[in-house]
């Protein structure tokens, strides 16, 4: 242990030279203890989950860089919290190298947030992990990046091992599998490769689509797949594509995937995203930090593509709050997240920002038509005022998906009046090329303002 404490102390010393005292004290002050060295991994005790994730996301590459420059060897660092030690009792357990050497214990079924978009994938994954009889084989889960596929893979592995510590579970990313195969091939140790991957009970393969350009590896994986399948070993595969969309993957491999159960994971809906954010706040263990409902709604509304985007936004807020303040409001949150929010604010459904959008749209339109804002919003029936007024209604609907009722409240008009105004503009655009050019120009101005001010 003395050797590894020295290594970590040396790395910390170099980190303190690179970063400010504020950054160092905030992140590394309480990460001075090496917890243990096991399976060629140096375990460092982190203050909490938030600090641990922060180090992984921001500083791990620098830590590895410093390590290589001073010690001339590839050292593996893993950060662990007291909570994880207590829950898993990892200090008293000697797991098979196939298992906890490559499974992430923070992923489990308990902290996987279920919604309509992932419910079936969750249920089938759990069923596989609990059943001794293999009935679903292979299980193929696909969906966009950051929707929880990897979480489910690790959850399956962790649950199987918890139920039966003698089970040999191997989680591997497709790119790691390819690299391993190539290295063993070069060193003429292909039998070692086969022994490693065939001497298992469960194979969890992540991101199979990466194998698309690795023809030789595909052949070897096909042989492995058949060997495991025929010997009644469980196989679970994830991808960002459905089997029908996989390109440059051998047809006989695809047919093997399609012989099992194929499940997709879709994007989570708004309510589901809020639940995920609440879970992330709990995981980060930041008890004194307050993030109100409006701010969570901001994140959930704007970051809709994947969970990692939301987590990144939440981490950014935590960093700011931890450094400067224990509490922030919506306006401050919007400013902190500004670099991440470009082109996304139109998704935000908060009432105050809806008003802000409409106001800024009207500033651009009134300037273009050389009329006053109060005239644009007024009741004058002259075409000079009604045309830009209707354009504002139309663009509020088209660009920002406001409902007729929402637009009506702003203009003090009923649903029918807003609907008629929008339809008039649609008709004019179809019939009048010059008018269409004017509307397109206004849209361009609005989007330009969006990029510079992030309305």
Swiss-Prot record:
Record-stated family: Belongs to the DnaA family.
Function noted in UniProt: Plays an essential role in the initiation and regulation of chromosomal replication. ATP-DnaA binds to the origin of replication (oriC) to initiate formation of the DNA replication initiation complex once per cell cycle. Binds the DnaA box (a 9 base pair repeat at the origin) and separates the double-stranded (ds)DNA. Forms a right-handed helical filament on oriC DNA; dsDNA binds to the exterior of the filament while single-stranded (ss)DNA is stabiized in the filament's interior.
Xref: Pfam families: Bac_DnaA, Bac_DnaA_C, DnaA_N
UniProt KW keywords: ATP-binding, Cytoplasm, DNA replication, DNA-binding, Lipid-binding, Nucleotide-binding
GO cellular component: cytoplasm; plasma membrane
InterPro entries per UniProt: AAA+_ATPase, Chromosome_initiator_DnaA, Chromosome_initiator_DnaA-like, Chromosome_initiator_DnaA_CS, DnaA_C, DnaA_dom, DnaA_N_dom, DnaA_N_sf
Free-text comment on this protein's domains from its UniProt entry: Domain I is involved in oligomerization and binding regulators, domain II is flexibile and of varying length in different bacteria, domain III forms the AAA+ region, while domain IV binds dsDNA.
Source superkingdom: Bacteria
Compartment list: Cytoplasm
Region (Domain II): 73-101
Organism: Phytoplasma mali (strain AT)
Region entry Domain I, interacts with DnaA modulators, spans: 1-73
Subunit structure, as described in the record: Oligomerizes as a right-handed, spiral filament on DNA at oriC.
Region ranges (Domain IV, binds dsDNA): 322-455
Keyword Translocase carried by entry: no
Keyword Cytoplasm: yes
Gene3D superfamilies linked: 1.10.1750.10, 1.10.8.60, 3.30.300.180, P-loop containing nucleotide triphosphate hydrolases (3.40.50.300)
Region (Domain III, AAA+ region): 102-321
GO biological process: DNA replication initiation; regulation of DNA replication
Residues annotated as binding ATP: 146, 148-150
One Gene Ontology term of the molecular function aspect: ATP binding
Protein name: Chromosomal replication initiator protein DnaA
């Amino acid at each position: 242990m003395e050797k590894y404490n020295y290594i970590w102390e040396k790395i910390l010393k170099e980190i303190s030279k690179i970063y400010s005292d504020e950054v160092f004290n905030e992140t590394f002050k309480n990460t001075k203890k090496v917890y243990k060295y096991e399976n060629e991994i140096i375990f460092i005790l982190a203050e909490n989950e938030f600090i641990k994730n922060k180090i992984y996301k921001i500083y791990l590459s620098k830590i590895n860089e410093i390590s290589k420059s001073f010690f001339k060897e590839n050292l593996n660092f893993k950060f662990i919290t007291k909570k994880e030690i207590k829950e898993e009792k990892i200090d008293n357990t000697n797991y098979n190298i196939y298992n906890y050497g490559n499974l992430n214990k923070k992923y489990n079924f308990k902290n996987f947030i279920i919604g309509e978009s992932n419910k079936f994938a969750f249920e089938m994954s759990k069923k596989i992990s609990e059943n001794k009889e293999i009935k679903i084989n292979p299980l193929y889960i696909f969906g966009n990046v950051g929707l929880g596929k990897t979480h489910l893979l690790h959850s399956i592995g962790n649950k199987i091992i918890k139920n039966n510590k003698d089970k040999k579970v191997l989680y591997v990313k497709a790119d790691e599998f390819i690299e391993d195969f190539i290295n063993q091939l070069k060193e003429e140790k292909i039998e070692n490769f086969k022994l490693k991957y065939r001497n298992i009970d469960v194979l969890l393969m992540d991101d199979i689509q990466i194998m698309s350009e690795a023809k030789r590896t595909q052949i070897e994986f096909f042989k492995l797949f058949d060997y495991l399948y025929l010997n009644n070993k469980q196989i679970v595969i994830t991808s960002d594509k459905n089997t029908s969309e996989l390109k440059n993957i051998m047809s006989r491999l695809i047919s093997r995937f399609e012989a099992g159960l194929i499940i997709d994971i879709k994007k989570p809906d708004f309510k589901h995203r809020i639940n995920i954010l609440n879970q992330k706040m709990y995981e980060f263990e930041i008890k004194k930090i307050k993030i109100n409902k409006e701010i969570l709604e901001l994140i959930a509304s704007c970051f809709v593509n994947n969970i990692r985007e939301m987590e990144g936004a939440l981490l950014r807020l935590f960093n700011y709050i931890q450094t400067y303040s224990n509490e922030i409001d919506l306006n401050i949150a919007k400013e902190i997240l500004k670099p991440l929010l470009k082109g996304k604010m139109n998704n935000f459904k908060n009432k105050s920002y809806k008003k802000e959008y409409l106001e800024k749209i009207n500033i651009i339109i009134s300037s273009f038509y050389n009329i006053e804002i109060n005239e644009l919003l007024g009741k004058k029936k002259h075409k000079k005022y009604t045309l830009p007024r209707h354009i504002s209604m139309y663009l509020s609907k088209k660009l920002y998906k406001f409902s007729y009722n929402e637009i009506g409240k702003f203009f003090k008009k009923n649903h029918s009046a807003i609907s008629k105004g929008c339809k008039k503009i649609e008709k004019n655009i179809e019939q009048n090329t010059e008018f269409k050019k004017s509307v397109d120009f206004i849209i361009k101005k609005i989007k330009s303002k969006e990029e510079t001010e992030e309305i």
